[in-house]
UniProtKB/Swiss-Prot annotation:
Region (Important for dimerization): 244-279
Keywords: Cytoplasm, Heme biosynthesis, Metal-binding, Oxidoreductase, Porphyrin biosynthesis
The protein's name in its UniProt record: Oxygen-dependent coproporphyrinogen-III oxidase
Biological process annotations from GO: protoporphyrinogen IX biosynthetic process
InterPro entries xrefs: Coprogen_oxidase_aer, Coprogen_oxidase_aer_sf, Coprogen_oxidase_CS
Organism: Rickettsia bellii (strain RML369-C)
Subunit record text: Homodimer.
Residue sites binding substrate per the record: S102, N118, T119, R120
Gene3D superfamilies: Coproporphyrinogen III oxidase, aerobic
Length: 279
């Protein structure tokens, strides 16, 4: 395992966490000031993993963001024998290192899309990057969806013209609820096991994916910050959030990885919305 690679990736994920939290708090402040309200602030709590490593949860429950969580973690140790066969390169001795950031935003307004994003770096006897971002609007708009996709396409095209179509397809396939035969949202990009043989290039790409999110999602939120919405629209949002919960508990790799490596349960389930309904 490469100590330098572990340090620079972990440092970047911490830096990205700080940038995201600062921008989301700024949005809270803009809205609260206009409405004469007290803005929400992120509350941080750290946790340690018995087998090695730990992380920091940052959660804000505000006036714009009903619940937004930004997690960073760096964990290491050995996979259980039952889990080794599922992770590339872990079948030899089970040793692993994983560092990353994961964030999920659930907005009060049903007109503003929910958003999920994560990027990570993992080492076993092999090493790779993974991650992506996806948008879940309750009332989809073509222009908004196109803008979200364009930001990630621009990041992808800097490195390989084949990245965006490949990663978009993987996102569409991954965020699909098989039991309901419907997509979770309008997609984005999703990549995993990325190792081109050039660590610096793959790391730079992963950084640009994070920067792409910062360039587009705050703008999407601000565009609808002051739009009025109805009780009926809120009710529909709560029902559609059920799909989000179903996916995360049934299919999400990150949820499974966290639970199988004895991660912090509250951090793992942070992605779940604070309020949800089933019809």
């Amino acid at each position: 395992m490469n100590k330098k690679n572990r340090e620079v990736t972990s440092s970047w994920f911490t830096n990205l966490r700080d940038l995201v939290c600062a921008e989301f708090e700024k949005i809270e402040e803009e809205y609260a000031k206009a409405k004469g309200l007290k803005p929400g602030k992120f509350v941080r709590s750290s946790w340690e993993r018995d087998g090695g490593g730990g992380g920091v949860m940052s959660v804000m429950k505000g006036k714009v963001f009903e619940k937004v969580g930004v997690n960073i973690s760096t964990v290491f140790g050995e996979f259980s024998k039952a889990f080794r066969a599922e992770i590339p390169g872990a079948e030899l001795d089970g040793k692993f290192f994983a560092t990353g950031i994961s964030l999920v935003a659930h907005l009060k307004s049903p007109l503003i899309p929910a958003m999920h994003f994560n990027t990570r770096y993992i080492e076993t006897s092999k090493n790779w990057f993974g991650g992506g971002g996806d948008l879940t609007p309750f009332y989809p708009e073509e222009d908004e969806t196109a803008k979200f996709h364009a930001a990630f396409k621009e990041a992808c095209d800097k490195y390989d013209s084949g990245y965006y179509p490949k990663f978009k397809k993987q996102c569409d396939e991954y965020f699909y609820l098989k039991h309901r035969k419907e997509p979770r949202g309008v997609g984005g990009i999703f990549y995993d096991y990325l190792n081109s043989g050039n660590f610096e290039q793959d790391f730079s790409f992963t950084q640009d994916v994070g920067k792409a999110l910062l360039s587009v999602y705050p703008e999407i939120v601000r565009n609808k910050l002051f739009l009025p919405w109805t009780d009926e629209q809120k009710e529909y949002q709560l029902i559609r959030r059920g799909r989000y919960v179903e996916f995360n508990l049934l299919y999400d790799r990150g949820t499974k990885f966290g639970l199988m490596t004895d991660g912090n349960v509250e951090a793992i389930l942070m992605s779940l919305p604070p309020e949800v309904k089933w019809a």
